[in-house]
Structure formats: structure tokens, C-alpha cells
Amino acid sequence: MLATTAAVHAQRVEVYRQLPSDQITASASSTLRGSSAAAAVDGAGMRGDLHEANNLGHGMWVSQASAGTVRYSPSTREGVVWFLCQVGDKNSPPRQIDQIRIWNHNQNEHTRRGLNKVYVEYSADGQTWQLLPDGRLDYYVIPESVGRNPEPADLILNTPGLKARYICFTAAAGGEGNHYDRNDPVVMREAADMHQNPDYYGLAEIRFYTKERADVRTLAPVSELSLAASQGYLKTPEGPSREFTLRFDNPIYAGADLAFECGGRTWNAEIAPSGVGVVRYDGLFPAGYMEETAKLDVRLTSRQGTVEKRFEVPAARKWTVNFLSHSHQDIGYTHRHMA
């Protein structure tokens, strides 16, 4: 019996399960036409756990131009904008929320609209509110989206055991609510040159998760790998090493071992178990310049599946740098002098 129990225990891993988006209702202090609060909780623009940037800002929430101060209720913090998420309906009991993931505003050339300094408060009934601190700070800082396509979550809040029906995000006033630094003349000059109004605020997506122990056999299997080899090298003690990214068709929760072979050289890597789920592995080829096309054999071994695949790695682009000599002769003042 002990052996059987141990075997069953070994087949279970911690996993964060997303609360269905149709159970989340969003509202905001204001919304720009075509950029509703609902767009930040309904999965629009999401591909799995990644958000796809959009030139026009589709699938994201954007406020109207906001320069004054507002608050959701007399019991919540004051700020420049607020964004409220209701979990379930008004008659449902508070839900357990063990993790919150936030994707900041991800519109190309407008990522500074993303929220920056934010107060996070929660409530079971919408009347009594409690502040969710970040350690000793009474606020969180949501990093600016870097505009990758697709983009992983910019901030993950671990909230073990939190029970709430309402979660309110209030962006601080005084120029700290988004990523337009009003004290940086370069930032403000860029905004003016691009005809950007720094008083807009936005978010791409917010998701809520509960933590549970899941049987590995119920997890989506990992059955496919894809490889992207960069054209860049990193400086390492052994010499320049080329970067690569390995992506998985489903998140890896149970951990995995990776074995590589390329050009007669072998190496290994390990992916630790993760309740969030790992969807990519960033690695380095062995030191040395890769000037010819090479074969890369990869073997992934996990309780979620075993995959073997051979990739053809194109040679890294070769660069030729030419230095041209340049001379200058001063021919003096060229304007005609008046007598």
C-alpha cells in the first residue's frame, strides 16, 4: 500500500488552473471607444499564455484621456484610473485566487500607456476592501511591455489562499500611473514628435488562477518541439556562444530533461517543475562560430511525454565590416567678401 501511495503521489504535480474568462466581468473608470474593459479579460489577442502585439491596439483596454483623480469607491485608493474585475456573479461566493497574471498594454509604439505604479485591492462583498501589498510596499510596479510578439506576462502576483469576488487595480496619480515619465525630457519629446497623448492608460490582459495538484496523466502531453536559432552570440568564458530558443506545443508542468547533440558535441539541460508551465527553453550552443549549416538532435524526456527531433540549423549570418579612410581639407571661408 505504501508503494502504491508513493507512486500515485509521484504522478501528481502542482498546476495553476485559469479561472474561465467567461466568469470574469471587467469595468473601468473610463474606456476609449473600441477598447473596452472586457477586451482585457476575454482572451482577445492571447495565444496560449502569450499576448500578440497589435498595431492598432485591438483586444486591449484603453482609458479615455485622464488627468484628474478618481476612485472606484470611498473605500479604495485614489488614482488616475481604476480597473475592476468581478469574479463570478454578485450572488456567488468569493473565489480562491492563488495567482494573478498581468500582460501590460502591448500596442506597438504605445507601450508607455501601460499601467506602472498600481494599488491592488480586493473585496468579498464590494464594500469592505483590503490592500494587497508587495512586501513592504503598498503598491506594485507593472513593467512596461517590451513589445515582443508574442509577449509573456509582464507581472505575476502570487496570492496563495486569497479569497475575493472583486479585485480593483488603481493606477497612481501624479504622473506615476503609466510609463510616460513626465520628468524625462527625451520621453516627452518622443511623445510630442509621435503625436502621443501621455494621459491614456491601458492593459492587454489579466488572468486569475487557482492552484491544485493534478494527475500528470490529465495534463496535455508534450509532443512537438520547434527551434529558432538566433544570429547573435553571447560572450562566455569558453568563447562566443550562439543563442537558440526551443518551444513546446504544450506547457511543461512536471519538469523535463533535455539532451542535445550537434557536430559531435553533446550537452544536457534540465527544466524544473513549474506550476505556471514552461513553454520555451532558451539555451546556448557550445562555444564557437557556426559558419556552416549543422544538424541538431534534441531529446526531451518528461512525465508529460518524450520527444526526439532533428533540426537543421542554418549557418549564422556572416558580417563584413569595411573601414573607409576619410580626409578633410579646410578650404577656409567660402563666402564672397565685400570690398
Which residue stretches match the model-derived regions?
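Aromatic, loop-rich ligand-recognition surfaces of beta-strand-rich domains
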Residues: 11-15, 52-133, 151-217
